[in-house]
Amino acid sequence: MRILVINPNSSSALTESVADAAQQVVATGTIISAINPSRGPAVIEGSFDEALATFHLIEEVERAERENPPDAYVIACFGDPGLDAVKELTDRPVVGVAEAAIHMSSFVAATFSIVSILPRVRKHLHELVRQAGATNRLASIKLPNLGVMAFHEDEHAALETLKQAAKEAVQEDGAESIVLGCAGMVGFARQLSDELGVPVIDPVEAACRVAESLVALGYQTSKANSYQKPTEKQYL
């Protein structure tokens, strides 16, 4: 089984860290391939970045479908950019890290908080929660003003900031689990879970395991209505 993890931004450093973490959690024999577009924003930190990145993400999926299709796709950005569009392009399972993590939290806790990056993404995070049908379980959204690459620039300081925000979510907001709201936070879930005493869900790990399960069960993306292949038309 091969899962293609696509980091929609153009940061190869982030792609490498995502690939390493993903390979550690999947079953023996599952291969993680990880790529990022060569063009587009270096990081995705808002709607404008996401709009630019989505086009190049779709190009990567189209190339993979032509040249070397995987068994499943994972979109490794917590905004789940282009998720529905990619589901239209392929029959294979496509998993967004946000949808996977939000749903995963429901199996281990009655409530969850998302600890993410910048205040500007709050509206989009609420929309992701609504789309997942999880609004009634959301305790809070914590946005401690961390950039996507904060953990690559000053890991210790970023981790302390993340830990404090998650601690507040548990102690003050009633969160019984924490969803890490950025692929750049990969690799810290277990440490935080041990310190906080609640499940902390890494979205990349969750998405890869969900994708793996979908392939193992033989499930494909339905083409009944919503995710039908795009109709043929002229593109200028």
Curated annotation (Swiss-Prot):
**Record-linked InterPro entries:** Asp/Glu/hydantoin_racemase (IPR015942), Hydantoin_racemase-like (IPR052186), Iso_Racemase_Enz_sf (IPR053714)
Q: Where is this site: Seems to be responsible for recognition and proton retrieval of D-isomers?
A: C77
Q: Name one GO molecular function term.
A: amino-acid racemase activity
The alphabetical list of record keywords is: Amino-acid biosynthesis, Coiled coil, Isomerase
Query: What are its GO biological-process terms?
Result: amino acid biosynthetic process
Reactions the enzyme catalyzes: a D-5-monosubstituted hydantoin = a L-5-monosubstituted hydantoin; D-5-benzylhydantoin = L-5-benzylhydantoin
Which residues does the annotation list for site: Seems to be responsible for L-isomers recognition and racemization? C182
Gene3D superfamilies with a match to the protein in the record:
3.40.50.12500
What Pfam families is this protein classified in? Asp_Glu_race
The entry's description of pH dependence is: Optimum pH is 8.5.
Q: How does activity depend on temperature?
A: Optimum temperature is 55 degrees Celsius.
Task: Please summarize the record's notes on activators and inhibitors of this protein.
Answer: Completely inhibited by HgCl(2) and iodoacetamide. Stimulated by dithiothreitol.
The EC number(s) attached to this protein equal 5.1.99.5
Q: How does it assemble?
A: Homohexamer, homoheptamer or homooctamer.
Report the function annotation for this chain. Involved in the asymmetric conversion of racemic 5-substituted hydantoins to the corresponding L-amino acids. Catalyzes the racemization via enolization of D- and L-5-monosubstituted hydantoins. It shows preference for hydantoins with arylalkyl side chains such as 5-benzylhydantoin (BH) and, to a lesser extent, 5-(3-indolylmethylene)hydantoin (IMH).
**Which family does the entry's similarity section mention?**
Belongs to the HyuE racemase family.
Q: What is this protein called?
A: Hydantoin racemase
The gene name reads hyuA
